[in-house]
Amino acid sequence: MKKIEAIIRKCPYCTVGITDSEGNPYVIPMNFAYRDGIIYLHSGPEGGKVTMAEHHPRVCITFCEGHELVYMHRQVACSYSMKSRSVMCHGSVRFIEDMDEKRRILDIIMQQYVDYEFKYSEPAVRNVKIWEIKVDKMTCRSFGLRPSEV
């Protein structure tokens, strides 16, 4: 589990797969934080992705770390691969409405990116949508890595 969490922490963003109103997949990059089996996201208070998550709260979140082209034989196309690791998480979105809880989670999200504290104005906290996803399934995969690198 520590290796999986290390991959997540190396990622500057994740991609979130949601289902739209017609049942089609909708995948978007989002900033995030991960702590204790929970993924936190933030967005504007309304819009397409919020509406989709309200109607279809099941999501798939992917993290991918490392992007190096490798090959076994330079002249054999099928021997090429991308050297990387990925983590796929499944869970359900719950939107956080409590103002103090939103501030706490905003701190967690910002700690993912910077090492200093923020103060949040009342309107800023009120106008942000905080997504909480408790991960109920997590898988990991590596590509193009030697066994010693996995």
Which residue ranges define each predicted feature?
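Beta-strand-connecting loop/turn residues
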Residues: 37-38, 57, 136-138
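Short, structured patches in soluble enzyme cores that scaffold and shape functional sites
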Residues: 18-20, 63-65, 135-137
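Helix-adjacent hinge/juxtasegments
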Residues: 49-73, 78-80
